[in-house]
């Protein structure tokens, strides 16, 4: 543990800046803020909407993809030119990945019957176009399926929200009130109990 910790702290260019989790959970680190108090946030087919209007996407907006080559590995020089760090890429070499890759249609094989190399990469549109245009090296590029996205807040199966279709969710503003219902309670319950420290009870009519 100590050796690994030292390795990470001493190599910020490789692993990035180490951010410590605050003791006060109300001061959590925010990587990207897209909505403010009083706004209604929604994501429709990957597009962030505020109060029903699409916001301007960042120039270097990234999505995760699975990239299969025609056989060779992607050269380190190309990764450097694209700006993809070693920490941001995963080579899916373990045989345990094969079923999932085949289900996505990443089925290109070499003469020995082994699947051609597949990478999991975060790509901007420019990176995507550059790779896709290299027909000698790149066989297929598939956007990461929702099943790989992990958990979404709130942890409630009934919302069926995912990272590309999320909400709408109203962001509470100071002094404003909202009527709690069985449908919206999962959204605000944790905020009320864990962050505001209030007691919440649901009573029958």
Language model segments and positions:
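Soluble "head" domains of membrane/secretory-pathway proteins
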Residues: 1-205
